[in-house]
């Protein structure tokens, strides 16, 4: 055994410079040495200060020189920690040292040359992982089978519990990514735990997690619960004797509350019990013996898991970098600020609440223009009409809102609105076709019904097109024109009603020709809806000579 101890000391002296050059970061090697009591607290702080002044290789070279003066047990522990998986992943140059390590040297031998520490310092040391595991099992003395078979009934819902998963005993270590890609969990400290929702008021369903031990970037080693891909750290599993030591290293206090993506669960049995549901994740129940929580925001970004200048959410413990937000912020906003998860959770919570029954409302009255009323709306029943004065620019009629399936305007009502161009004159419509010959070249628009037609097809005996106010054969027949002058049928004396303005109480509107689908689509593409409304308002301002007065 003595020969093996001397061999380890000689190997450390031989590879001291190589190890110091391979260590380019104090974490996780230095923190692991402090956690396993290989490096005391004062030497830990001294190495960190030296790293800031001279660099990491020089600081570790001085630490290894000091370690050569220690007993053989400390050197054995150093080699064990150095060749752990997370150190080999973090420091790739250590593989060459491991490959050249003598095969006959056993690093698993027991430590006999090191005396256990006694006195007050021994009380400050954190217990070994097996002791922690035993402490974890004591609060949950109920067997998993009993918890799984236990059913809790709540009003309006039936809860089901899942059987606990079997712990995987062949997993020695599990590596989890942090901001720098390093996060480790101790081996053989995983156990499936199923908690019924009835144990904690305000929770729904059963939450199943795995108790694990986690080593964080700051060097702290704590118990946490794994639920899916998330890890939550209850304050109960923190060792009280090790908090002072961990606080001195990390410079920040531990988070004592169990967090499940924004959900907070306080201690059952207190006067105030609050359960915050955010992001739609069910809250994780806390243990009955958990101490009073002290709400604080996290000291790392919830997106990239890195520190720095963070903006804290006022609705949950999360914190974010301004650049990690979506969309990113340029500066910290003033007043209260909530993250997208809190806002989404509020919307989902409002939608999940039952709506208060309201008395049935009367059908809304929709004011529409008189000139835009279709023929089908006139036969739906009596309507309340306002008495219009002679100098009114626009006349409105209050109609009961029609059925959603019924269109407000029919193609026959849109024909006169879309017939005029920018100058109020009919023009050629390339996409429309004549109703007689079916040809779409050089077609004209009727000034009354906006139907596409050829002059030669509707009036083959006419010599030329008189005027610009052209009408098709059907519209000219209604107004009794002469075949040679169909566009002059409208009298010029007296006020002329707007084309397409439906008369109140007149049933002749149902005889308006219906546009084909191609004609209607072409008209809608050529004219905007604002132009249609503007035309309607201008047309409605003209006095209606043929319209009877409205009844009061």
Swiss-Prot record:
Domain HSR: 1-106
Short motif (LXXLL motif 2): ranges: 64-68
Residue span of motif LXXLL motif 1: 8-12
SAND domain mapped to chain residues: 182-282
Biased segments, Basic and acidic residues type: 504-514
Reported tissue expression: Highly expressed in a few cells in the medulla of the thymus (medullary epithelial cells) (at protein level). Expressed in thymic but no peripheral B-cells. In secondary lymphoid organs, expressed in a discrete population of bone marrow-derived toleregenic antigen presenting cells (APCs) called extrathymic AIRE expressing cells (eTAC)(at protein level). Detected at very low levels in thymus, lymph node, liver, brain, ovary, lung, testis, kidney, heart, spleen, bone marrow, skeletal muscle and adrenal gland.
Keyword Repeat: yes
ZnF region ranges: PHD-type: 298-345, 434-475
Gene Ontology molecular function: any one: chromatin binding
Species of the source: Mus musculus
Subunit structure: Homodimer and homotetramer. Interacts with CREBBP. Interacts preferentially with histone H3 that is not methylated at 'Lys-4'. Binds with lower affinity to histone H3 that is monomethylated at 'Lys-4'. Trimethylation of histone H3 at 'Lys-4' or phosphorylation at 'Thr-3' abolish the interaction. Binds with lower affinity to histone H3 that is acetylated at 'Lys-4', or that is acetylated at 'Lys-9' or trimethylated at 'Lys-9'. Binds histone H3 that is dimethylated at 'Arg-2' with very low affinity.
Gene3D superfamilies documented for this protein: SAND domain-like, Zinc/RING finger domain, C3HC4 (zinc finger)
PROSITE patterns: HSR, SAND, ZF_PHD_1, ZF_PHD_2
Pfam family, one: SAND
Outcome of mutating residue 299 to A: Abolishes interaction with histone H3
Motif (LXXLL motif 3): 414-418
Identification of the protein by name: Autoimmune regulator
Effect of residue 312 to W: Abolishes interaction with histone H3
Region entry Disordered, spans: 109-177, 472-514
Result after altering residue 313 to Y: Abolishes interaction with histone H3
PANTHER family in the cross-refs: NUCLEAR BODY PROTEIN SP140, NUCLEAR BODY PROTEIN SP140-LIKE PROTEIN
GO cellular component assignments: cytoplasm; female germ cell nucleus; male germ cell nucleus; nuclear body; nucleus
Short sequence motif named LXXLL motif 4, residue ranges: 520-524
InterPro entries linked: AIRE, AIRE_PHD2, HSR_dom, SAND-like_dom_sf, SAND_dom, Sp110/Sp140/Sp140L-like, Zinc_finger_PHD-type_CS, Znf_FYVE_PHD
Disruption phenotype: Deficient mice show an altered thymic organization with altered morphology and location of mTECs. They exhibit defective accumulation of thymic dendritic cells in the medullary region and generation of naturally ocurring T cells in the thymus.
KW Cytoplasm (keyword) present: yes
Gene: Aire
Role summary: Transcription factor playing an essential role to promote self-tolerance in the thymus by regulating the expression of a wide array of self-antigens that have the commonality of being tissue-restricted in their expression pattern in the periphery, called tissue restricted antigens (TRA). Binds to G-doublets in an A/T-rich environment; the preferred motif is a tandem repeat of 5'-. ATTGGTTA-3' combined with a 5'-TTATTA-3' box. Binds to nucleosomes.
């Amino acid at each position: 055994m003595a020969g093996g101890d001397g061999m380890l000391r000689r190997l450390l002296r031989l590879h001291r410079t190589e190890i110091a050059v391979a260590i380019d970061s104090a974490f996780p090697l230095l923190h692991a040495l402090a956690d396993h009591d290989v490096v005391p607290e004062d030497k830990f702080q001294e190495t960190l200060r030296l790293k800031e002044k001279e660099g990491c290789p020089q600081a570790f070279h001085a630490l290894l020189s000091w370690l050569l003066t220690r007993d053989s047990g400390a050197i054995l522990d150093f080699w064990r920690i150095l060749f752990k998986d997370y150190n080999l992943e973090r420091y790739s140059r250590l593989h060459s040292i491991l490959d050249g390590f003598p095969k006959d040297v056993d690093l698993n031998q027991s430590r006999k040359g090191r005396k256990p520490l006694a006195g007050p310092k021994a009380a400050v040391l954190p217990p070994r992982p097996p002791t922690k595991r035993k402490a974890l099992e004591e609060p949950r003395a109920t067997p998993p089978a009993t918890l799984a078979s236990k059913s809790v009934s709540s009003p309006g819902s039936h809860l089901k519990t899942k059987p606990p998963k079997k712990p995987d005993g062949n997993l020695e270590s599990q590596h989890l990514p942090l901001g720098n890609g390093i996060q480790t969990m101790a081996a053989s400290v995983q156990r499936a735990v199923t908690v019924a929702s009835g144990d904690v008021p305000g929770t729904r369903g059963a939450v199943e997690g795995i108790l694990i031990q986690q080593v964080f970037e700051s060097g702290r080693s704590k118990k946490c619960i794994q639920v899916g891909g998330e890890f939550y750290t209850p304050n109960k599993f923190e060792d009280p004797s090790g908090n002072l030591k961990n606080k001195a290293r990390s410079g920040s206090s531990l988070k004592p509350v169990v967090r499940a993506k924004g959900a907070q669960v306080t201690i059952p049995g207190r006067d105030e019990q609050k359960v915050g549901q955010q992001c739609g994740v069910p809250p994780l129940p806390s243990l009955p013996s958990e101490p009073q929580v002290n709400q604080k925001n996290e000291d790392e970004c919830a997106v990239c898991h890195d520190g720095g200048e963070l903006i804290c959410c006022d609705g949950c413990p999360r914190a974010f970098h301004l650049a990690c937000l979506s969309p990113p912020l340029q500066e910290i906003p003033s007043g209260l600020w909530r993250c997208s998860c809190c806002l989404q959770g509020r919307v989902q919570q409002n939608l999940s609440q039952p709506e208060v029954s309201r008395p049935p409302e009367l059908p809304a009255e929709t004011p529409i223009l008189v000139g835009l009323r279709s023929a089908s709306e006139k036969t739906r029943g009596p309507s309340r009409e306002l008495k219009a004065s002679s100098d009114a620019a626009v006349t409105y009629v209050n109609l009961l809102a029609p059925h959603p399936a019924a269109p407000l305007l029919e193609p026959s009502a849109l024909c006169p609105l879309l017939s005029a161009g920018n100058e109020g004159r009919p023009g050629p419509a390339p996409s429309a076709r004549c109703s007689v010959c079916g040809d779409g070249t050089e077609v004209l628009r009727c000034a009354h019904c906006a139907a596409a037609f050829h002059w030669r097809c509707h009036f083959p005996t006419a010599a030329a097109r008189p005027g610009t106010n052209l009408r098709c054969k059907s519209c000219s027949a209604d107004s009794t024109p002469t075949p040679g002058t169909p566009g002059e049928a409208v009298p010029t004396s007296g006020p002329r009603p707007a084309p397409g303005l439906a008369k109140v109480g007149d049933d002749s509107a149902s005889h308006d020709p219906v546009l084909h689908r191609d004609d209607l689509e072409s008209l809608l593409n050529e004219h905007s809806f604002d132009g249609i409304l503007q035309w309607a308002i201008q047309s409605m301002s003209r006095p209606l000579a043929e319209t009877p007065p409205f009844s009061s």
